[in-house]
Amino acid sequence: MKIAILSRDGTLYSCKRLREAAIQRGHLVEILDPLSCYMNINPAASSIYYKGRKLPHFDAVIPRIGTAITFYGTAALRQFEMLGSYPLNESVAIARARDKLRSMQLLARQGIDLPVTGIAHSPDDTSDLIDMVGGAPLVVKLVEGTQGIGVVLAETRQAAESVIDAFRGLNAHILVQEYIKEAQGCDIRCLVVGDEVVAAIERRAKEGYFRSNLHRGGAASVASITPQEREIAIKAARTMALDVAGVDILRANRGPLVMEVNASPGLEGIEKTTGIDIAGKMIRWIERHATTEYCLKTGG
């Protein structure tokens, strides 16, 4: 097969591993910067160009689209989809997952347990919002945040009000969420491919911090997950219509809670921690699903 990887930086670990895994299985691979793609949207002859040349047909596309370029990155991916390329994750699913508020609403509708979460637009509702999630300590999150950026633990009610007011002063959209104290700064990252959790790690926050993201200095170890955690991770990925997802779970006294579903999970931390060839599993998923029937169905 001919596979395109959409990424702004082909030197990143995840891109290199996906490229290596695809080549090892006999596929042709090209890494394309989505911001250098431009499109002819034409009902008679739609096409996509890259740095002055018209791109050939790709059997499959692996999107590694960062949050900062979600709008144009998903537009480029959508063009590949229109031309019959199989997307490892569909553009509509990526856009949906990037909206934290919408994601939580969809997950809640499917009965997936979450931390109690509130959102309000008016400053007049701040006090009620804090009470809604059980008071302080609580977590304030930017809706557009990623990798632990824009996440603040407010340990007192006064601190919570100050943080919420400060974010509102920046015209930022925020979520207010209960703090799961018993998680003790740890979460579980489950890597889902299709209908299987292929790997899981426990991420522990750096001493003195509460965010466990590896990009923020957290440490990782292999996690043994329960059948309930496995089931909830797969259900969360399926709810978001993602074939590949990083599902972050908090272990609360009342059971596992889904904190976030990531549409473009990094591979470095979880592969190096577990020793599992996740990139290879992703390529094998593509091989099973990037079929002639898919191309015919989508017009390729």
Curated annotation (Swiss-Prot):
One of its GO terms (cellular component) is cytoplasm. Disulfide bonds: none annotated. It holds the Pfam family Rimk_N. Keywords: ATP-binding, Ligase, Magnesium, Manganese, Metal-binding, Nucleotide-binding, Protein biosynthesis. HAMAP family: RimK (MF_01552). This is Ribosomal protein bS6--L-glutamate ligase. Belongs to the RimK family. Its EC number is 6.3.2.-. Mn(2+) 1 binds at D248, E260. Mg(2+) 1 binds at D248, E260. Its cofactor is Mg(2+); Mn(2+). GO terms for molecular function: ATP binding; metal ion binding; ribosomal S6-glutamic acid ligase activity. Mn(2+) 2 binds at E260, N262. An L-glutamate ligase that catalyzes the ATP-dependent post-translational addition of glutamate residues to the C-terminus of ribosomal protein bS6 (RpsF). Is also able to catalyze the synthesis of poly-alpha-glutamate in vitro, via ATP hydrolysis from unprotected glutamate as substrate. The number of glutamate residues added to either RpsF or to poly-alpha-glutamate changes with pH. GO terms for biological process: protein modification process; SOS response; translation. It comes from Shigella flexneri serotype 5b (strain 8401). Mg(2+) 2 binds at E260, N262. Gene3D superfamilies: 3.40.50.20, ATP-grasp fold, A domain, ATP-grasp fold, B domain.
